[in-house]
Regions:
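Nucleotide phosphate-binding site architecture
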Residues: 113, 132-133
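Short arginine-rich
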Residues: 133-140
Length: 174
């Protein structure tokens, strides 16, 4: 994202989402990532951008995106907790089709967790820490349905105990 007029009129600033430190001699040193991002397939994924694109889908009321670890992979895969608009059903095949048109494949959540209501703090911020901790473990998600976009498929499917075990064993190449 290139921003204009950040420090002075006419300047340009390339927002990488990285925090760097000036170590002198015209050198910068990487310190950390800013904002809520994760790295998947060698790319930085902005959770806010993915959430906004997901919420452009007609039947989704809310989306909370975060990164989760998959055994035998590098980085964190995208996962989204989603809630439908009241009285609406989510067509998961159509949702994936929509997401594939709107964003690069590395940014599309691999896992979805359908919730009736999002947990929020007293200041109405989403509770991502519990979602991250529970990850895509079917035993930790309180019976809420989980879906997975398996490699070489064109749809989300229900995450069963058998699929979960195969993911843990590294049977799929994400």
């Amino acid at each position: 994202c290139i921003m204009h007029n950040v420090f002075e009129k006419g300047d340009r600033y390339f927002n990488t989402g990285d925090l760097v430190r000036d170590i002198g001699f015209r050198h910068a040193q990487f310190v950390d990532r800013l904002g809520d991002t994760f790295r998947w397939k060698g790319e930085n994924v902005s959770t806010t951008e993915v959430e906004n694109l997901m919420c452009s889908y007609h039947s989704l009321a809310e989306a909370v995106v975060y990164g989760v670890e998959i055994p035998n992979t590098n980085g964190r895969a995208g996962m989204a907790a989603i809630t439908p608009h009241e009285g609406m059903e989510i067509d998961y095949a159509h949702l994936l089709e929509h997401l594939r048109k709107e964003m690069p494949s590395y940014a599309i959540p691999v896992f979805l967790r359908q919730q009736q209501k999002m947990e929020t703090t007293g200041t109405f911020k989403y509770q991502k820490n519990n979602l991250k901790k529970e990850s895509f473990d079917t035993n930790a998600t309180h019976g809420e349905p989980l879906f997975v976009w398996l490699p070489n498929t064109d749809h989300y499917q229900l995450l069963t105990a058998e699929i979960w075990q195969n993911i843990q064993k590294g049977a799929y190449r994400f």
